[in-house]
Amino acid sequence: MRPVAQERAPPVALRNKRKNKMNEIKDSKKCLQRWLERIQEKRPLLECLTNVVTINDVANVILACGASPVMADAADEVPDFVNIASGVVINVGTMQNRGSYEIAMRYAQEYGKPVVLDPVGVGAAKARTTLTTALLRRYPCAVIRGNASEIRTLAEGAGETKGVDAAVGDAVTEETIPARLAVVKAVANRWHCTVAMSGAIDLISDGKVSYACRNGVPWMSNVTGTGCSLTGLTGAFAAVAEKSEMAEAAAYATAMMGMAGEAAYAKAKSLGLGSFRVYLIDALSTILEQDVQPRLELL
């Protein structure tokens, strides 16, 4: 997930603090397996307009789950790729070729393709806030995925972020889940889509069905591109989902990325962040073989 100014609590501590274990999803790894089988059967092509900092990682994560990325952002070819794609991923991180974002969303609407939007740094700079809200006003979006500060900005129209990181005051903890979930639902209802808020606890909702995900490790905040990669992974799940399944699709994509982080950390903790980054891709490509479980809960 995109870096947040708070470390994740260890999984055991989180489980001990859980207030409502009755809502924990059973057989969640089998559910994840069914999603991956659907992706690997359909091998959806994703048209990705992502940022130049993390483009390679995003492409590799999409490949690791069984989907296929095309990273074409030139305005004159975006319509053709949206037409043949199963879904569209837009990340406004470096705002290069920003005119292509609107073209992609316009043609995605015309062709009926789901869009996953990552509003990187919204609230930190007026230009990207204006751009993102303008896109959302004009075109439908299947999933918005961002950190707590970015999502709050989309709910309130103003926010405070530390560059592209979430502000400390926006951290998602056991105590702040109700307040943060209210923000997630507000954005989902405002823009008529599923919203995935990344944090120490991830929150996902379409305004009606809501999930909490407790997968992941603090090291994920120290490697650039984990949030962008999760957006790409979410795009793969969204591309094979029905409209009514978008919240579930985003929840399992979120869990899968967190699970991969846990598996990668187990191997790389004595080596360092460079090895962790490599092991993260390894774990994503073999996630069902890893000794990790989705920790998803219906709220």
Question: What positions do the PLM features span?
Answer:
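Active-site cofactor/substrate anionic-group-binding motifs, chiefly glycine-
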Residues: V61, C65-Y111, L117
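Glycine-rich phosphate/adenosyl-contacting loop at the front of the ribokinase-like
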Residues: R18, M22-M71
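Conserved phosphate/ATP/ADP-binding segment of small-molecule kinases
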Residues: R128-S210
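Short glycine/threonine-rich catalytic loop with a Thr-x-Gly-x-Asp
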Residues: V217-T234, M246-A247
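Charged C-terminal helix
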Residues: D27-K30, M259-L299
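Conserved post-catalytic alpha-helical subdomain immediately downstream of the catalytic base
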Residues: T234-V278
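Glycine/small-residue-rich loop that forms an oxyanion/phosphate-binding "nest" at active or ligand-binding sites
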Residues: A104-G146
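Acidic-glycine-rich active-site phosphate/pyrophosphate-binding loop
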Residues: E24-E37, C193-N215
